[in-house]
Amino acid sequence: DSQFLAADAVRHTKEMQENFAPDIASSVERSQIFRRGTIGEISKNTKQGLDTQLLKMDTVTALFSLPADSHVCLLNFASFRYPGGQLLSGSMAQAEALCHESFLYNVLEKQTDYYAWTNQNTNHGLYQDSAIFSPDILFFRDDREHYADVVTCAAPKRSCLFDRKPRFTE
């Protein structure tokens, strides 16, 4: 039920802020916004010997299948326009699921410049090349905890690729 999920999301984000304010503030401060032209900055900072895995399971299950001391970066298939997607409205897609099991929403909601820019630059639903890198997001499942870095990035809306009329105005 979406009303239950919405109420749970509000409770969860408040609880995260109360219990993890210093960790959230640290992640917000160290988060980075990347837009077209900054890929060079990313590649300069890439460590050698990265291990990439594609696993057939949900993102948080994959995270907890790894050793607790693993340094992991997760991809958040995000809303281009809203931090945490429709989390506070009770939706439950991948972006919302990540927020329900972490303090990711608390970090993303502080990225007001990013979301102000993205809401003004929707490119008719095809969006722009942009992402947020958020380090050290704490995830919870059962009685376990695991930190992971998160890249929040939205894919273009497939329906807009074939739509002759823009869904959003610039």
Language model regions located:
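Macrodomain-like recognition of ADP-ribose-binding/processing modules
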Residues: 1-170
